[in-house]
Structure formats: C-alpha cells, structure tokens
C-alpha cells in the first residue's frame, strides 16, 4: 500500500509544525512545534484565540498594577502570551516547543540570557519542565555566546536566522542543542540577486542545509539540524533524512495529500565517509566570514529587523486591546 510523502518523511525525519495556530497543530499532530513573533502575532489576531490574548493582558496588568502604562503591560503580556501559546501547544504535542527571545536583544548576550531565564521560569510556573522548551535565539555571535551559557545551565536552545556555515559551525562548537538553517529565505536572496529560478537539488537553501548536515555528522557534533523556512514541498523532499524539518501547516497538508516514493537524501553514515575540511570559528573568523557572505549578512540583518517589527506590531495590538478591555464595563466579559 502506497504511503503519503508525509508518512514516509516521518520515518526518517522528526516533523515539526511551524505555526502558533493551535487548531492547525491539532490537525497535523507533529512531534514538536516552533513559534516566532510573526507566527504569534498572526495567531493572536485570530478570533479563536481572543480569550488567551485577553486573559494574558489582564493578568499582565494585574502583575504590574493599574497605574502601569499600556506599553509596559503589553511588553510583559507578549512574554506571557508566547508562554500561554506554548503551554497550549505542549498539551497537544509529545515533544518540545520553541519560544523566541526578543529579537531586539540579538546583539546583547546578557539581556538574552536574562530573558531566557524569565521564559523558562514562566513555563515552570505552569508546571512545564525546561526539557520541553527550546529557547530560540538569533544566530549572531552574541546570541551564540548566550546559548553556550544557557546550555551549560541545562537550558536548551534553538539558534535561528541561520544562513551561513560560519554561524552553523560556531553554534556546534558552542554545544547548542539545535540550529534552524533557513532554506526558503536563502532561495529568496539568490533569486533576487541572480534573477534565476532554482529547483530541487540546485536550490541554494537546500545546498546550504545539506552542507551543514554533512559537516555536523562528519565531525560528530551533538547539535542537530532542523531545516526551516520552506517555500515549496520540493525543498522538503530534497532534505528527507535531515534530523528535523519545521514545516508550515499548508505544506504539511500538501505532503500528506501526495503519494510518491520518497528516497532518503541526507544520510549520517554516508556523511562520516565524506572528504570535508574542518574549520574553527573564533570571533575574528566569524566576523570575517560574515562580512564576506553577502547573503548571510543581508538575511540575518533583515530577519532580526523583521522579527523586531513583528514584535513591535504585536505590542501595539496588545496595548490597543488593553485599552478596549479597560474601557469595558465591569461584568461585560
């Protein structure tokens, strides 16, 4: 009996849902789930989650007191909201959820560590152990240093917005749990830069993840690779066998609807026998490689700016909703 592409993929790769939409997660039943400020913002705007948003806002206001300015309440509410969505998601999935620190802290090691501690503490207050949470941090040099410290404390990290080999190797050498190289965003950059289209194994994003995966397996790093940011199912098919792949509900449904043979493309045993040169990445090497890699430089900067903007938009949305709730007569809810 033939199987769907998704069913075959699950046999060789841990399938993760890339969404904050709890109903979508219930439908696709992944092992793990990843969220980010853009996904939380999208979910927070859905009528189905209005109660979670409202309860989180009122709780943040209660914590800070009635006289606290709405923007300060909104800031705390976002942290609480990310954890509230994470808690609901963890009630559905057997694995872990990734919750992102504020992207505006991407170049501040100490502030990133402090917020990671706050997120883990919030989960623990909800009865959720740190082993079920991955702290998502942008793959800047400062972010990688924060993750290195957090891992030593037993707080597991997912290093995101990863576009270059220098970022990947620095993460592996720091002993982080997981990295998320962004397949689709790499493709976007090359399409715009060259005016060409890329399909299948020729996709630069696919090539980047393949190179990183083979490097990690060749040299026995414990850091696992989770391909992210897919534009089409073709990219996913080319990365079958990767440790994990985080996929949007739409593409998960497409994979589930199609039946065809799915061969393993990435193989840890084969990677061990490959001729690959080892590199060491200190800060000077990282900065040099980053400056020379236009794509990684551009996409990391753009990604941090994009997540920061999404966060600011959500905080404005939350502040506006807080004012509406404050104006409602007592007992109206």
Curated annotation (Swiss-Prot):
Domain of life (superkingdom): Bacteria
GO molecular function: transaldolase activity
Biological pathway: Carbohydrate degradation; pentose phosphate pathway; D-glyceraldehyde 3-phosphate and beta-D-fructose 6-phosphate from D-ribose 5-phosphate and D-xylulose 5-phosphate (non-oxidative stage): step 2/3
Keywords, alphabetical: Cytoplasm, Pentose shunt, Schiff base, Transferase
EC number assigned by the record: 2.2.1.2
The protein's role, per its UniProt record: Transaldolase is important for the balance of metabolites in the pentose-phosphate pathway.
Name recorded for this polypeptide: Transaldolase
CDD domains from the UniProt entry: Transaldolase_TalAB
Entry's Gene Ontology cellular component terms: cytoplasm
Compartmental location: Cytoplasm
Taxonomy of the source species: Bacteria, Pseudomonadati, Acidobacteriota, Terriglobia, Terriglobales
Pfam families from the UniProt entry: TAL_FSA
GO biological process: carbohydrate metabolic process; pentose-phosphate shunt
Family: Belongs to the transaldolase family. Type 1 subfamily.
Entry-linked PANTHER family: TRANSALDOLASE
Catalytic reaction equation(s): D-sedoheptulose 7-phosphate + D-glyceraldehyde 3-phosphate = D-erythrose 4-phosphate + beta-D-fructose 6-phosphate
InterPro entries xref list: Aldolase_TIM, TAL/FSA, Transaldolase_1, Transaldolase_AS
Principal location class: cytoplasm
Record text on subunit structure and interactions: Homodimer.
Catalytic-site annotation from UniProt: 136 (schiff-base intermediate with substrate)
């Amino acid at each position: 009996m033939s199987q769907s592409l998704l069913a075959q993929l699950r046999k060789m790769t841990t399938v993760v849902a890339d969404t904050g939409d709890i109903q979508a997660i219930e439908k696709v039943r992944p092992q793990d789930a990843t969220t980010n400020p853009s996904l939380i913002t999208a979910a927070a705007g859905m009528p189905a989650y209005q109660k979670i948003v409202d309860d989180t806002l009122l709780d943040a206001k209660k914590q800070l007191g009635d006289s606290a300015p709405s923007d300060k309440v909104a800031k705390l509410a976002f942290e609480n909201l990310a954890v509230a969505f994470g808690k609901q998601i963890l009630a559905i999935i057997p694995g872990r959820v990734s919750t992102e620190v504020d992207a505006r802290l991407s170049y501040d090691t100490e502030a990133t560590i402090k917020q990671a501690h706050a997120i883990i503490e919030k989960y623990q207050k909800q009865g959720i152990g740190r082993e079920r949470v991955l702290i998502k941090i942008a793959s800047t040099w400062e972010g990688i240093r924060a993750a290195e410290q957090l891992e030593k404390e037993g707080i597991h990290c997912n290093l995101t917005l990863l576009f270059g080999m220098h970022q990947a190797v620095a993460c592996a050498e720091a002993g982080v749990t997981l990295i998320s190289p962004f397949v689709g965003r790499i493709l976007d950059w090359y399409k715009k830069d060259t005016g060409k289209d890329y399909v299948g194994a020729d996709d630069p994003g696919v090539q980047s993840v393949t190179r990183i995966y083979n490097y990690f397996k060749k040299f026995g790093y414990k850091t696992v690779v989770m391909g992210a940011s897919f534009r089409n199912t073709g990219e996913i098919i080319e990365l079958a066998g990767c440790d994990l792949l985080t996929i949007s509900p739409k593409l998960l449904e497409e994979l589930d609807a199609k039946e065809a043979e799915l061969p393993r493309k990435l193989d840890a045993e084969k990677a061990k026998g490959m001729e690959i040169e080892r590199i060491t990445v200190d800060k000077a090497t990282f900065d040099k490689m980053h400056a020379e890699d236009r794509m990684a430089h551009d996409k990391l900067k753009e990604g941090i700016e994009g997540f920061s903007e999404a966060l600011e938009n959500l905080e404005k949305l939350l502040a506006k909703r807080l004012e509406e709730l404050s104006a409602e007569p007592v007992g109206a809810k």
